[in-house]
Amino acid sequence: MREALDIRVHGIVQGVGFRPFVYRAAKHNLIDGWVLNGIDGVRIHAEGEASDLDDFVLELSEHAPAASRVEEILLDEVPLEGFDSFEIRHSDETSSDATTLISPDLATCDDCIRELFDPDDRRYRYPFINCTNCGPRYTIIDALPYDRPSTSMAAFPMCPTCAHEYADPADRRFHAQPDACFDCGPHIYWKETADAATPTDSDVHENADTNARTRTLRDRYPELEWGSDLTASDAIIERACSWLHDGRILAVKGLGGFHLVCDAANPETLAELRARKRREGKAFAVMAPSLDAVRACCAVSPEEERLLVSPAHPIVLLKKKPGAVFAAGLADDLSELGVMLPYTPLQHLMLAEFGSMLVMTSGNVHDEPIQTDDEAAWKALAGIADAFVGNDRAIETRFDDSVARVIRVGGEAAVQLIRRARGFAPMPIKLARPTNGTGQEHADAPIILAVGPEQKNVLCLLRGDDAFASQHIGDMENAETFDAWLEAKDRLERLFDAKPTVIARDMHPEYLTSKWADEVRRTHGIRVMDAQHHHAHIVSAMAEHGIDDAVIGVAFDGTGYGFDGAIWGGEILIANRVDFERFANLTYVPMPGGAAAVKHPERMAFGALWAFDLIDHPGARPLKDRLGDAANVCASMMERGLNAPSTSSVGRIFDALSALVGICAHARYEGEAAVLFEAAIDGCETRDAYEIAIVKNAATAESTAHDTSVVLLDSEPLFRGVLDDLTAGTPVHVIAAKAHNAFVQAIVQTCLLAQAAYDIRTVVLSGGVFMNRYLIEHTTASLMEAGFTVAINRELPPNDGGLSYGQAAVASARLGSE
């Protein structure tokens, strides 16, 4: 007996070939009816025998396209309408509940790569080849549902051949919205920086909105050298690679913005790029032409290989092979290199032509967001790039490359994200929300906007139990980055039809995002909820793992506003999602000069030695000699209590130790001193450790559980031990290993004390210091050996890039407890 079902599929089901998959599954299971894209996902009307309908629904759930993610399938019995075939219908734009999830951009698939290099294929060497399994998604979407008119591909009407493929259910490009070829475009162009470009008058129209959607850069600048056919396109690629071989720097437009590109093996060009971009020491990421090229210079485990070739194609931090030679200025003094493989057709063509590794670094001016608009890039990057390889497909939102690594946790490989952007965002991260006393359902829960921190900003929009963490935005230090933050916020709210009614923010009153939240509260009356920085770190990992009960939370990072007004960063908390107690913290040390101590770690070292009365230790003499007169200035600030804030930050202690042993006196980028201190371990396997004393803290009448810990982690013995070893001539790699081991032991010992006091055996590790591979791998192993269950961030970075998710989780929990 025939029956009919109304089927709604929620998840990442648009832009990933889901409707063609449904069509084929319907044909396979003898189902009649239709499928369409709705604002709330994919909707299907299915008619057939009951057993065939069961098989059809099972196929939908178990054999969906690899790039899709089915969150739920809702079934309702409906009356038969008498269909005798199955069809794909035009999208439904009338649904009122915008619950569709949008796919991130996907790296070029193997089928498209084969066609790209097949001389007999009509898309041979076409720089924008794609299909339903790969290509741009989120970076070209302007509105939902995901159809070509709602993307930046609206400006490129399909040629008859592409239109036929698009309409053929048996074709891999059936309903592939970015589908294109040389005949219909888009196309690349070549522009030398010295060449002026003047837009034509024809770009001015009465309807500016229509113009923006249907006019292209080529309409505005027809005089540029355009790669309109195979010959012209190849000529641009060949010239670009010739310039790169000659030591030039190019700006090349990618999926989410421009890259600055140069020969990774040319030290003179690397030095020039650093000078032009004002990027003094931070390592460059490289793009390799193949896995074999990566294996030639880096150790690649099976897990790292899978990450490199995954649909996200992130930059993967790999250990350099012993004896591998790298150009000066690429990733000096580091044991790891950031490597990625080509993920766009143009990159495949350029890397194949060039033949070896290229530097691919974000196309931006120092401390500003990545450039996405061609005309703006010509101006902003004119002082950096010698020429531009751009195109006339508009980028709807800026995206940097994601960065990840594989670490060992409890003997098993785990992916740790360092920067979550292209290939991952805007996929939501589930955040189970508690109901309040009225049994409020998730869908009716307030929409929360978590505005994120000051550094490595990512914002997060919580709708129901879907947390939409934005792409990496950057450090909120200038108007340009704040504008990018506003753009990302507005885009998330618009695409997911989610207007926040609650704002979650960091406690720090001077953060730009905190001030923005204050202004919104004042002008719109929206509720604003504060989340302490380190509590949000811990809750970010708790929420990822669905942990509701209290945990021992170890939050180690560089900074964070504390309840006592000091700069925290070495915290061990007893925390649930709603609140926390400060169980332990690293002893405070002064930061002479405040922010200057971050840029000049020798000041940090001097401050620690001054606080611990170790200035006159013989091992401190080289530090004082290097500081010279600055030592007296630092001492004066600390004695008078002027511009010498106190901090418990582990990040700052690693900075101080790095400077003390002579590794890094001046940090050229955020975290450099600590990064180099970890790199100095250089395979040292000593189990010896300095001491970090655990002592009972003294409370005062004003003390609270929020600001006064039960015990202190006293780092005076650590610094004394380092000074003793410096005096004795102990090698720096041994000192670095012993210092790291000291923190591992202190964490385990303190967690054992907390477990005895609170009967908690789950430990959560979060905060930027846990990007330190040595520390997180040794700490997780030691905690597990001690019988603890350990949770770390998996879908988000442990650094401030995961903080907004934690802010949203804290606010949600507090609302649920009211």
Name these PLM-found stretches.
Residues 506, 524-537, 761-766, 773, ...:
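Conserved phosphate-binding/catalytic loops in two-lobed NTP-binding clefts
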Residues 77, 249, 257-320:
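A phosphate-binding glycine/aspartate-rich beta-alpha loop in the early core of alpha/beta enzymes
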Residues 1-178, 182, 186-189:
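Intrinsically disordered, low-complexity, mixed-charge
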Residues 295-300, 349, 370-377, 402, ...:
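Conserved phosphate-binding catalytic cores of ATP/NTP-utilizing and phosphoryl-transfer enzymes
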Residues 542-610, 615-618, 639, 647-648, ...:
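Active-site histidine-anchored catalytic micro-motif
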Residues 63, 165, 173, 354-437, ...:
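Internal gly/pro-rich beta-alpha loop/helix module
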Residues 251, 497-509, 528, 758-769:
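Short glycine-rich phosphate-binding loop at a beta-alpha junction
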Residues 185-187, 453-483, 487-491, 607-760, ...:
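A contiguous, well-structured pocket-lining segment that forms one wall/lid of small-molecule binding clefts
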